[in-house]
Amino acid sequence: MKIIHTADWHLGKILNGKQLLEDQTYILDMFVEKMKEEEPDIIVIAGDLYDTTYPSKDAIMLLEQAIGKLNLELRIPIIMISGNHDGKERLNYGASWFEHNQLFIRTDFTSINSPIEINGVNFYTLPYATVSEMKHYFEDDTIETHQQGITRCIETIAPAIDEVAVNILISHLTVQGGKTSDSERPLTIGTVESVQKGVFDIFDYVMLGHLHHPFSIEDDKIKYSGSLLQYSFSEAGQAKGYRRVTINDGIINDVFIPLKSLRQLEIISGEYNDVINEKVHVKNKDNYLHFKLKNMSHITDPMMSLKQIYPNTLALTNETFNYNEENNTIEISEKDDMSIIEMFYNHITDKKLSDIQSKKIKNILENELRKED
């Protein structure tokens, strides 16, 4: 049996003001073409199909087109669950009707102990839920953390487990020790959101969404597919794609399959003038770029200048300010006003004040002192 594991499509994502629908359309078209080659028995999408609870019309249309090609044209069964970014009601609309075409959508706990059986493999679904939702569902006020809530869910599933069959869990959560990125919205505020690996011991394999790194956790049977695209600059350089999971005679193996996106996220460090004069290495001018530059404080609008050469510049950081405070502590009380100004100017521009600048500043300081007298 062949299963394709994917998650975290985040359709409708906007990165630093840039709409990513073109990139998402490109990668989904590639994903569909790959599925024609793979001919899987089922596709699992482990949450966060959309980036927001109320996705745009274009994002909804993009999902419908992709799912239509995969499920209706290629006739591949699909199981999808909701993630913390998805609007459950919107994603679940028409779910009972879609099941006639083997498109299984799960957004709540009503079916957590009723597996979806495909080719003798039992797929248990555990969509994302807040601690409050789990507390309400189980009518148990003692549930205060995700660990407690997920443990309660697994205890509910346990009696239904067929130990003779292969049992797979699909969920959207953070496993303790998993690598995170900036684009992952925290699941909770003020409480620990991670879940210990041991809670999943009753399953033969676990397919997860939420963490965007495809190798977020090192485990033989607990796997994240990672996101289809790089969605924050903390993910720059990360491989993106999907997992191919095969089951032969009860033995489960998986391999990560990378996909090449239309554009990459790239971080460029250096001197402002070198970048403007195109003396730094940029993999692709069309990439989404974050520049971390020195010596640009004298430039009125450096971002505009950068965008004229690199149109997809999305972020700009003045590296001058990124210094080690412990090694650059200045006892201000021991410095006179002129010395402080000279040090500040040198720190910002890496230059010394000219004689003319020094003279003007001294005159200003002397005038201020006379006013005080």
Curated annotation (Swiss-Prot):
Transmembrane residue ranges: none
One Pfam family linked to the record: SbcD_C
Source organism superkingdom: Bacteria
Protein's GO biological process: DNA recombination; DNA replication
GO molecular function, one term: endonuclease activity
Keywords: DNA recombination, DNA replication, Endonuclease, Exonuclease, Hydrolase, Nuclease
UniProt keyword Signal present: no
InterPro entries: Calcineurin-like_PHP_ApaH, DNA_Repair-Maintenance_Comp, Metallo-depent_PP-like, Mre11_N, SbcCD_nuclease, SbcD, SbcD_C
SUPFAM superfamilies: Metallo-dependent phosphatases
Classification via Gene3D superfamilies: 3.60.21.10
Quaternary structure note: Heterodimer of SbcC and SbcD.
Family stated for the protein in its record: Belongs to the SbcD family.
Entry function: SbcCD cleaves DNA hairpin structures. These structures can inhibit DNA replication and are intermediates in certain DNA recombination reactions. The complex acts as a 3'->5' double strand exonuclease that can open hairpins. It also has a 5' single-strand endonuclease activity.
Record protein name field: Nuclease SbcCD subunit D
Origin species: Staphylococcus aureus (strain bovine RF122 / ET3-1)
Phylogenetic classification of the source organism: Bacteria, Bacillati, Bacillota, Bacilli, Bacillales
Gene from which the chain derives: sbcD
